[in-house]
Swiss-Prot record:
CDD domains: SHMT (cd00378)
A GO MF label: glycine hydroxymethyltransferase activity
Lineage of origin: Bacteria, Pseudomonadati, Pseudomonadota, Alphaproteobacteria, Hyphomonadales
UniProt EC number: 2.1.2.1
Quaternary structure and interacting proteins, as annotated: Homodimer.
Name of encoding gene: glyA
Database matches in NCBIfam families: PRK00011.1
Sequence similarity: Belongs to the SHMT family.
Residues making up the signal peptide according to the UniProt record: none
Protein name: Serine hydroxymethyltransferase
Length: 435
């Protein structure tokens, strides 16, 4: 038997027993500070949410140790029988949530889900038609700085200037002129429901594959508060966080078996190696939660809260893009107030309200400045906020923007910050975490 004096620390117990606070107090302090920030601030970033403790536990589990290249039952490594269970649970729950035949839960992000679809059905130089970033689309839909705008001939459609809704006449004209191999719907800053049927008709007319990126509204679809794009599209991609309220990750869905096989090969071995099994376990937990009746109530409240906040912003004298929202997010045009999105974001954060500066349709300002902000209701709704709280939030936003426009927002920021702290104290998250 080995002399205990020479037993490595990993076998002596320290490696498996010493926690983060002792092992790395500097990092532990930063995590604790972030927990405190999340507790005391109102989160309005539309792409963020708050996961359950169960999701946290799954994502922080020992599944992080396991490599599992391949798919359940067809792995390239041994010892995968239990991680196979986790992935199979995630797949079956995703299929049930979205009423579809096939799901790939391995993409590490929404961007990689889109990249996987491109790898599966396109070749470099093919033409894609997607919503421009300026109109509310996403980088991966053909924006020039993104790989999708470099590898493909990316044509971009936008919104109508009079109402900021998708310009389907333009979509149809561009589709017929360019004959794209793929048409993409969905975006990161479009607050209205999308006519998927109209998009599919245009795609069929030109022989294009129709892809819907539902990263922002997938949770609304899962809970029945938004039309299901899989009733019309060939392929849907999504993140697994945002309104779906799971860990950060991606997913690809389809009803076409031939496409599903191509997608699986495109993800592995096409663009990824071993999947993140601890994250896939977190996805499985979140999908299980989304199948519960309470999730339907949650997403209905998300939409109602977003509408209440948008209406309160209008009442406060702010210009709401498209005059409202059908989803979880709203865009505020600050040009009539003479305030930039960058300044509004900073002032709101000083008041403990977190949002993001965002371009608006036909924005004259650069993306580092912007003329608007994007606000969303998912995280606040998870905390328990209802219409009353979101009306108050919209009022606070209006007060701070007005104070900025008048040249000095310090006093208003200080007052709102204390009021926000009082509100968040009534709706705590993660008892025992943060201060």
């Amino acid at each position: 038997m080995a002399d205990s004096a020479h037993v490595p620390e990993t076998l002596a117990g320290g490696f498996f027993s010493v926690g983060l606070a002792e092992r790395d107090p500097e990092l532990a302090a930063a995590i604790n500070q972030e927990a405190t920030r999340q507790q005391h601030q109102i989160e309005l970033i539309a792409s963020e949410n708050i996961v359950s403790r169960a999701v946290l536990e799954a994502q922080g589990s020992i599944l992080t140790n396991k490599y599992a290249e391949g798919y359940p039952g067809k792995r390239y490594y041994g010892g995968c029988e239990f991680v196979d269970i986790a992935e199979e649970l995630a797949i079956e729950r995703a299929k049930k949530l979205f009423n579809c035949g096939f799901a790939n839960v391995q993409p590490n992000s929404g961007s990689q889900a889109n990249q996987g679809v491109f790898q599966a059905v396109l070749k470099p130089g093919d033409t894609i038609l997607g919503m421009s970033l300026a109109a509310g689309g996403h980088l991966t839909h053909g924006a020039k700085p993104n790989q999708s705008g470099k590898w493909f001939n990316a044509v971009q459609y936008g919104v109508r200037p009079e109402d900021h809704l998708i310009d389907f006449d333009e979509v149809e004209r561009l589709a017929r002129a360019h004959r794209p191999q793929m048409i993409i719907a969905g975006g990161s800053a479009y607050p209205r429901q999308i006519d998927f049927k109209r998009f599919r008709e245009i795609a069929d007319d030109v022989g294009a594959i129709f892809l819907v990126d539902m990263a922002h509204f997938a949770g609304l679809v899962a809970g029945g508060a938004h039309p299901n794009p899989l009733d019309h599209c060939h392929i849907a991609t999504t993140t697994t966080h945002k309104t779906l309220r799971g860990p950060r990750g991606g997913m690809i869905l389809t009803n076409d078996e031939a496409l599903a096989k191509k997608i699986n090969s495109a993800i592995f071995p096409g663009i990824q190696g071993g999947p993140l099994m601890h994250v896939i376990a977190g996805k499985a937990v979140a999908f299980g939660e989304a199948l519960m009746p309470e999730f339907k109530t949650y997403v209905e409240q998300v939409v109602s809260n977003a509408r209440a906040m948008a209406a309160a912003c209008r009442t406060a004298g702010l210009d709401v893009v498209s005059d409202g929202t059908d989803t979880h997010l709203a865009l505020i045009d600050l040009r009539p107030k003479g305030v930039t999105g960058r300044d509004a974001e900073a002032a709101l954060e000083r008041a403990y309200i977190t949002c993001n500066k965002n371009g608006i349709p036909f924005d004259p300002a650069p993306p580092t400045v912007t003329s608007g902000i994007r606000v969303g209701s998912p995280a606040g709704t998870t905390r328990g906020f209802r219409e009353e709280e979101f009306i108050q939030i919209g009022t606070w936003i209006g007060e701070i923007v007005d104070a900025l426009a008048n040249g000095n927002s310090d006093a208003v920021e200080a007052r709102v910050r204390e009021e926000v702290k009082a509100l968040t104290a009534r709706f705590p998250i993660y008892e025992g975490l943060g201060g």
